[in-house]
Amino acid sequence: MSRADQERGARRPAAGRRAAPENPPRAARAGRGTAVPDARPARTARTARTARTTLRPAVGAAGPRRLARRARRAWDRPLTAYYLLLGGSLLITVLGLVMVFSASQIEALNSGLASTYYFRKQLVAAVLGTLLLLVASRMPIRLHRALAYPTLAASLFLMALVQVPGIGQSVGGNTNWLNFGGPFQLQPSEFGKLALVMWGADLLARKQDKKLLTQWKHMLVPLVPAALLILGLIMLGGDMGTAMIVGAILLGLLWVAGAPTRLFATVIAVGATLTVVAFTSSPHRMDRLRCVGATEPGPGDVCWQGLHGIYALASGGWFGSGLGASMEKWGELPEPHTDFIFAVTGEELGLAGTLSVLALFAALGYAGIRVAGRTEDAFVRYAAGGVTAWIMAQVVINIGAVLGLLPIAGVPLPLFSYGGSALLPAMFAVGLLIAFARDEPAARAALAVRPAGVLQSARRVLAGKRPESTANRARTARTARTARTARKTR
């Protein structure tokens, strides 16, 4: 054995015996009775803090990207449209009730009524509308389709009844109301919008099932003649605003149906021609057209309403003068609780309030487009497109008039302005969208595994059953999906 091997063997510890550390801990060097803490944990903590400080800019740079990914995943979830429609519509309705309460008190007192008269009527309509929304959201699609033809027939009958002398009532220069005695009045043309959406969607869906929509005559007939009949009955009463919305619904249905560009452009040209004729044939409508962008009341104060709507918005500032503190509603601004409630909202809640209202309507529009784009059911696609076109067109016409960008058309802000005749069919239409959003396959699966709510658990307890667990709900959903897949395979 060489001398180097002998030295290595001397340094190697014996078997079963642990080598003593060359640098014993400080506690051992200090003696048995003293305990000096080890400095290595402190150095480790300082090293970790230094590493976090060094990496902090990189984490901050990745933060916006991470938030963007999370937001994208949230928007792509199966129940996004369902919650946007349900939450957005209820928030708009509640905020509308608050603004009707604020904007209508002076108007009611000037009319010799109780200050809360209009608010109480709107509250009753909102409760009934919420019930209609819930009923429509739970109805199966086949029942929606079954109601299409009766709804159209009833709407046409009531709209024709308005034109009978002694029955129809004129409000604001338009003869489009039915008075059923007392404070209860009905505007049948509002239900005509809903009827056109449901009937038009069912008609186009049937034609698509028969492969007939590739022919232009099947795409136009009888949809366009029926829409022209509704438009004619509305224009007999002089309601140009509602006629424009019905035209927007027709264009929305044709667009979703995939009408050729030439056909679509022809329909738009005919509609524009009829609109020009309607404006030029009425001096009152021409006065409203001249008031677009006006800065003075004009002769006879024809632009008074639009001008004071701009004043209300301009005086609101960023956060408004405070709820109930509007000055324009004190007799200066006509119709502050109906057509120009958005102006009062801007004055009392400021730019923040108006942008919030716009954001809620934008959420409804996005959800409607998403439902129409993701479904495989033809009726759902056409009905969702029609309802979305209806609500968005009405929002644009109302807010455009308040901003002075469009002529005043006497159109209320959907789900927001005072008026039960406008609120009830609009909430039923939103209920249709909610039902369509629930009917998506991914949404059904997500709802099946969602934890049971309080009412569902209480119902099971009262029935003598134990509350269903999440695992059981997931198992039930998987079984249902397997059964549907098996049926499709067969």
Show where each model-derived region lies.
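Hydrophobic alpha-helical transmembrane segments of multi-pass inner membrane proteins, especially
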Residues: 86-102, 108-305, 343-401, 428-432, ...
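A juxtamembrane structural motif centered on a specific transmembrane helix
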Residues: 1-67, 71, 399-490
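Cytosolic juxtamembrane amphipathic/interface segments immediately preceding
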Residues: 64-80, 113
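Transmembrane helix boundary and interhelical junction motifs in multipass membrane proteins
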Residues: 239-244, 320-326, 336-338, 355, ...
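TM-adjacent membrane-interface loops and short helices in multi-pass inner/ER membrane proteins
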Residues: 291, 295-341, 349-353
